């Protein structure tokens, strides 16, 4: 739909039935928008996404993002946030967080609700998290440089093969 869109604001839209509507964008602000199909935001740089809804079929929606801020999202899809760098996620609900946040680095997480989150954070590094509530097994498997505070992780085998993990008040 908007391939290689730059320096733009997208507001109150619905992207449905069609792959990669905002692929390879730069300096985008996306607000109050619904995504109903897969791969909506791949290979974006300097991306801000706020008050958006990622429906069940928008799986694999946020991959290869460099420098992104994501706030107040409602995410029903699986396999979000892979191979991302320099991302901030806050005040967000992941209803099906399985296989999310894989191979990411330089990640800040604040006030997240993460359900059905098996293998959340796999092989990711340089993560700081605060006020996370995560339900799912094997979270942060093979992760590195992870600092979490004031969080609840209902998980078995969390941090398997992880290195340099610090948990405070968890």
Residue ranges and their predicted role:
Residues 1-170:
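Long, distal/terminal scaffolding or interaction modules
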